Amino acid sequence: MTVTRFSVFVIALLLSLGYGSNASAKGKGYDPHIDPTNFQTKVDNPYLPLVPGTTYKYLEKEGRDTRENIVTVMPDTKVVMGITCTVVHDVVNEKGALKEDTFDWYAQDKEGNVWYFGEDTKEYKKNGVDTEGSWEAGVGPNQPGIIMPSHPTPGKPFRQEYGPGHAEDMGQVIALHETVTVPDGTFKDCVKTKEWSLLESGHENKWYAKDIGVVRTESTTKEVVTLISVTHQ
């Protein structure tokens, strides 16, 4: 049997991400090979396209509480680990007051995997501003992870981020071809994921629609997030 260069690359990538071992669960041995020449400037994965000028409006509900979540793909970029990342601005408002203000950094490799390289986040609380969730890949032990694989397939968990003690989110594709109805419409053939943090209890399920991205999120805390609208500049 002939093993192609592409096959060797894929095998190496999966092993570096912890597939087929317990490295992804414990963090030990997680050291993905990041080559800037293997990344492109656009993020055009069908299930997580990040087109500058696109704004997503979501409604968050948990019991009687509601919050507005506005996610905007910025024209700005940020270089992380030598890679030009797309900047996404994520704002959460509650009763007209700013609650969270975050800048996330994403990049896509040439195989189509969307990587998460960190965030600059501020959470506004009664006693001040909390920036504990901020982290950047390549700084100290922090490493990037994959948010959306190039070819989503139900299987083993993978790391979405790795900052020991403060950024340890995991992801797992659990279903394909899901149909989801939200205020923005009905979407077929959605990818369903399970996502959780190794630092906290509980998890959430997300549905990603083709050519859109996240359209619905359900958490074990009973929080439900639905897509209200998508606009393009």
Where are these regions (language model features)?
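Bacterial Sec-dependent signal peptides at the C-terminal "C-region" and cleavage site
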Residues: 17-26
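Bacterial N-terminal signal peptides that target proteins for export
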Residues: 1-9
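Bacterial N-terminal signal peptides
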Residues: 8-18
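Conserved functional acidic sites
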Residues: 26-233
